[in-house]
């Protein structure tokens, strides 16, 4: 077994000192989320993650999910783990109490979900996708649909899926061919969907598919797509399960990673057509789908944080115990643990700093979503929504890029043993590699950030964030110590570069869309580095203040300061280096003709 210990102390620090959990719990409806309750939830979630989910992660990867006679069997221990997860009420943490949820902040729920994802990413994909289905039904479903489906989806008695992709319609959902035909009181759905996470499994007795399909008289393109609830088993008026719907799992994909997560090819309507129920209004499916998609994108970004943490813990433990070569300062001494060697330290510090920055960014973005959902002042709620919208593509793309990078670095620290499957380090990289691809590729996230989140509002939402960054730069100048001064200078230079890049995009992006798109990935990376550095700076300020308390954990706070300084020294300077590729790189990106490739 490869152990996982939930980093609860760091999670609490980020929630309380960087995000400001008291600000979130003071919002209407969140009064029950007292500090004692938050601590208890984190502790209990950590136990489930470490003791139940983590022990079956490696074996689940080796065994994988299998399809036998139309039935998907998840690996040994997964079904029992889901039973413990569901009976513990973990699925209901952030959802509306009116339908059986606990009504706790999304910020807390994301911290809890980080533990699931780090302990066992394949397992955690099931509740993550279910969460998106719940959100879509909550926001857009009729009262009748909510009455039938929401309670059991929230409790985890049933699970939900997202059925978007088709063989010819990947990122371009306008190419969807799945059809919906009106029938008395419902619709008949026919078509094939691919890459459906947990499209079939043995966790629950019913699976509720959220399916994008097109009516025969619908307008062309994305404006003619509708969203439907298509249950595996139809539901009788009394809530009991009726007959099997006309849908089936055709096959499971054989994948690079997340082997224990069944990725299904689903066929709808082989016979008379699967019965489906319209969500909201006809031809507004793409709009509703983005409720699911944005939730999933935040969740996938969290996977990047989680896999970084898991890979870091394993690499750290290996470096402490692997003895190889003498210490550079003691040529005649005995061989030492490789954690003593500077390059191994550099790699471990890189993994640690990037993971902490990504965690802070994700929690900060989700906290903005809580403000959007709950703030009593509509203007403040709108600001929260704008901030969450701005940061969602950054969370999804930057954090998953870091997840892949950190998992690869973890293998490097293991040396040759990292390339051997039984070590377990390779699994983290194989699992992580899908995260920059699904729920919208990171290239799509970069375009979303540039064109929809920055250019569309003239940089207004970004400007609000930059103002917060500037306040932190100034505050650091008035704090004692070389570390605070160095972080202030590094952050200030990064913000300068980010503001210049943003101004260039706002000025030229509409007139030169190809140029803006050519620099979009670099802009998103700059945005992630700078925002991560801003939040690491806030962490450093809080750690410095905390050191005044003689009862505080001084070693933990000292590590926070050192890690923040490392991020400022090693990563914030990269932001300025990306300015020229953003503003000038298009000249060569698009220079070759197609036949020159």
Question: What feature does the model see in each segment?
Answer:
Residues 195-197, 234-250, 255, 262-296, ...:
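A glycine-rich, basic-preceded beta-loop-alpha segment at the flavin cofactor/substrate interface
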Residues 2-5, 182, 258, 364, ...:
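Alpha-helix capping/hinge segments and adjacent helical runs
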Residues 29-32, 62-74, 284-299, 313-352, ...:
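Glycine-rich cofactor-pocket loops
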Residues 99, 456, 472-597:
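C-terminal amphipathic alpha-helical interaction region
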Residues 1-124, 148, 370, 580-581, ...:
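Amphipathic, small/basic residue-rich leader segments at the start of a protein or domain
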Residues 1-25, 274-283, 314, 320-321, ...:
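Acidic, low-complexity proline/glycine-rich segments
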Residues 65, 78, 129-130, 141-178, ...:
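Internal maturation/activation junctions in enzymes
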